[in-house]
């Protein structure tokens, strides 16, 4: 308790304080009694002390401070030695103390009450400032609680948003996987279709190739059938056989299937054309429809072209044009008879061929180019494809001479 100053004690009872000790000393016929007031917060007991004053009524001074009390050296000495005659004088002092207390009370006024100080009141009941502080503290606590609740709500919202984000991420990943799977399936289907299309294309190509081969074979067969049809036509020449017998080559062969093929050379054609009259083609055209109705087996012979224009073609092509092969097919027995007749006439043709050639040489200038070439080939001459008619006539004339 920080308190300093001078005051007069008029009461023998001071609450919250105790009297440590009391000694009485006499100086110049004055008896004084000092009080040492010490704070005692732990105990509630109070001791009563009475003040004694000298007859001249002189008051005593009590000073108190926060640092404690200052001891009077005289008072400390008195405390050491003590009052030996305190008990002896106690009876006489009581009356004097009562009188002094009355005098002090009348002089100093009302009693000094320490409980009325503001610090005792502050400890007993809170003041307005303390109430304001408590209210402010409560407000701060409420604000802090509100902030904590808001933070918790924000955390919950963030967690919910994160959960939604995770869900959206999972959904996106699933969509990506599904898209990849669908793309792979589409690629596989496309590859399968392409492979099937390639296989089908290969099969179609194979079928086309086989079809082309078959059609080409059929065309060849048809061409062969059209180029060499079986015919029962027999050409009747007005020229007797004895004068101009046909000369067959030794290459004629007979097949087992009752068919034979005879190769005619240009020589034979030229001899027959030379012996036949000029009106033979018209005669043939006139008698062709009548002979077609005849069922008998005959042989066919193609005539060479009436005129042959000189062209810059190879020697082999001309030989192919000159050589014409005929295949006559027949199943009747008459064909064998014709063959036997032809075989008999071969010998006669060989004998008469020399005579026919001698007669033909006389009129070489009247013959055509094709006929001249046939004669030259029959004589074994070569390199005739590029020669003209005059050159051939000279060659044949020089050869015959």
Curated annotation (Swiss-Prot):
GO biological processes: chloroplast mRNA processing; chloroplast rRNA processing; DNA-templated transcription termination
Claim: Coiled coil is one of the keywords in the record: yes
Basic and acidic residues: compositionally biased ranges: 266-290
Localization of this protein: Plastid, Chloroplast
Transit peptide: 1-63
InterPro entries named among the record's database cross-references: Rho-like_N
Pfam family, one: Rho_N
Protein name: Rho-N domain-containing protein 1, chloroplastic
Organism classification: Eukaryota, Viridiplantae, Streptophyta, Embryophyta, Tracheophyta
